[in-house]
Amino acid sequence: TYLGRDFLKCCGHDQKWQGMTEVFEKLKAYNEKKLGESGIDTLVTSCAECFRTFAMDYELEDMKVMHTTEYLIENGFEMDLAVSEDVTVTYDDPCRLGRQMNIYDEPRALVKAVDGVDLVEMEHTGEDALCCGVSSMMSCNENSRALRLQRFDEVKATGPEIMLTRCPKCVSHFEGLQFEGEP
C-alpha cells in the first residue's frame, strides 16, 4: 500500500534535535495515530532522518520501519538499469543512516547494480565517514563549513564525477558550497 506523500506530517526529526520537544511530540502523536489506523505492517522511507526517527523515536508497535535501500535489497528488486555513458561515483554515508542505523551496504549494492557505474570509495567511509557538518540545520557556520570542505576534499581526491548520498540535509549542505564559490 502506498500511503502517499501527504498521508503523514513531518517526522519531527529537526524539532526533536533542536529541543522543540512539544512540537516533536505533537507530530509524533499525529503520525503514530495515522500509521496505527492505516493497517500497514511495514513503513518504508527514503529519508535517512525520517528512517532514524520513525525507527528509534516512535512507538510503532508491530510495524517494521525500513529504509528504501533495505527494502529494495531485501525484496530482491532487480534494477536492470544502465547509464548512457560510463560514470564514476562515490557514496557519502549519512550520519543518521550509517552510524546511527547501520545501513552501509544496501545503498552501495544498489549503486553497483547499475551498469556503467563505477563506485569508488573515499578515504573515510562507513563508521569512519566524515559528517557533512549540518545538524538539524542549526549549525551552518564556519565550523560546519570546515567539515563540509574537509569532506569535499575527500570527494575530489577520490576523483568521481558524481557524489551520492541518502540524506536531504547532506545534499543541501553540500550544494551550499556551490553558492559559496566552492566545488
Regions found by a protein language model. Name each.
Residues 1-183:
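Iron-sulfur cluster-binding electron-transfer modules in prokaryotic oxidoreductases
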